[in-house]
Amino acid sequence: MPLFYVISHYFNLPFRAWEQRKLGEDVNFLNGRAYSQKELLDKGKYKVLRVGNFNTNDRWYYSDLELEENKYANRGDLLYLWATNFGPEIWNQEKVIYHYHIWKLKIMNINVSKQYLYTWLITDKERIKQSTNGTTMVHVTKGHIEQREFQIPPNLAEQQKIGTFFKQLDDTIALHQRKLDTLKLIKKGFLQQMFPNNDKEIPNMRFTDFYGIWEQRKLKSITEKITRKNKELESTLPLTISAQDGLIDQNEYFNKIIASRNTRGYFLVKNGEFAYNKSYSKGYPWGVVKRLDNYDMGVLSTLYIIFKPTKINSDFLTKYFDSTYWYRAASQFATEGARNHGLLNIAASDFFEIELNIPLNNEEQKKIGLFFQQLENIIILHQNKLEKLSILKKTYLKKMFI
């Protein structure tokens, strides 16, 4: 049974066939203002809203220009990003000037609900992506978008119910995202407080009944380097390191096979062993270290450095490498400016010379490791809830419009 019928029936709305019209018949796509770089100010009366402000760029430019009213976006306005990362957005902040790569949508037909139109445009974005092999880097022309045919219930009340339904779902997703972000900030804060800052012997925050100073130990004195190869093809599972998800199946992560078909020359990594990925990325300037938790074994390229803990609690070591306290030591062994094709030039012998500041009391190590593992489990639980809600929304959108 189509979802639009379910909603019509559930809300006691009369069922009528949906109409199909061109967007340009009901919606006016208003151009934003083009700015030269010299017109963009560091301070001013109005913020200038650019495409990047919806994504990863949190830097704002300003303008003191007084423009005609249709060049401003106000709270509640429906916008459409037509360049780079394209798609609809509802602006929910203060009055801004919107940039040239953004349209403001002015609905000309009083029988078209803004919230419904926003929801339909989300599904249309997915159709456009599919027609361009899934890329989000698309330039949508005004002529093209005005000719897009959209389906709409003639009953305004039905449109509003549909729009409200998805808005409530979006609000629930946003709430769970905020909870997840807060939990990650809490974890980050505890990592900063429960490990000693550089040159300090004790952390700012500590469990009761532990008093001794933390001492420095070289990684080589508390771990063992692993050089085991996959000669007998004990594993055919190629692994990769994700900064967010740890050591995971390479085929699933990239959605294709990256590793060589012959993995005999790869390292064989077993559950509980650690791998250092020397690839640097945003937020991880010295690479990442992760433990293999999700599989019994797997194979990794010899570009990785593999080791296992021998004289340190494994959970504690995992959380130590989740922090940034080892960055300073790692930076001392990397030649200045020597970063080759995204890889740091840290030799394995140098990596094991890294000094870690650790509590010598094994019980304290265990307690710290357990504390962060429990916090991580809560974070994973919220991540799973968020993923399920996102899947639910996609399913409803598909049932509704496609």
What does each model-found stretch correspond to?
Residues 1-402:
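Feature detects amphipathic, helix-rich regulatory segments
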